[in-house]
């Protein structure tokens, strides 16, 4: 997971949908599920939604275009995996669900929604000036479906 100085409305909406998907999985049971009976379907679908938002449309096109998976990997059912992009989402979602607890995800994502560094000084700049470190590492990625490129530039100003 990653976070910024504050969540923008699009990010709030995406995480809200992800939490709703997890909570609507019957296996969630209000958060009282056994470790081996976690809401895997909800977690996988929520992860797929997140994965789609982490890349810009052009990157999806360049990476996958309309490539199909090999015929020996297809089941023949009309709604099973057929495209490489579907296979990518499926693989990464299934990897995620066995390495992350659903309740932990729900609470961590909500905490990320609530956090706003401007709450600690009145503005992002004021909030960041309260952080006393010699060096800070800011890792940036190309703009995605859900990010705004100018957020990193704002951090460099402080």
Residue ranges and their predicted role:
Residues 2-95:
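Alpha/beta-hydrolase-fold enzymes
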């Amino acid at each position: 997971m990653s976070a910024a100085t504050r969540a923008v409305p699009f990010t709030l909406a995406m995480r809200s949908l992800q939490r709703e998907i997890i909570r609507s999985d019957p296996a969630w049971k209000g958060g009282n599920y056994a470790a081996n009976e976690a809401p895997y379907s909800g977690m996988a679908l929520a992860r797929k939604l997140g994965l789609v938002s982490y890349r810009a449309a052009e990157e999806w096109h360049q990476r996958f275009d309309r490539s199909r998976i090999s015929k020996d990997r297809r089941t023949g059912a009309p709604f099973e995996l057929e495209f490489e992009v579907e296979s990518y989402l499926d693989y990464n979602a299934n990897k995620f669900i066995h390495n992350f607890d659903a309740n932990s995800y729900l609470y961590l994502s909500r905490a990320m929604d609530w956090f706003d560094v401007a709450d600690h000084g009145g503005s992002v700049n004021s909030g960041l000036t309260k952080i006393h470190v010699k060096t800070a590492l800011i890792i940036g990625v190309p703009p995605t479906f859900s990010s705004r490129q100018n957020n990193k530039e704002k951090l460099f100003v402080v």
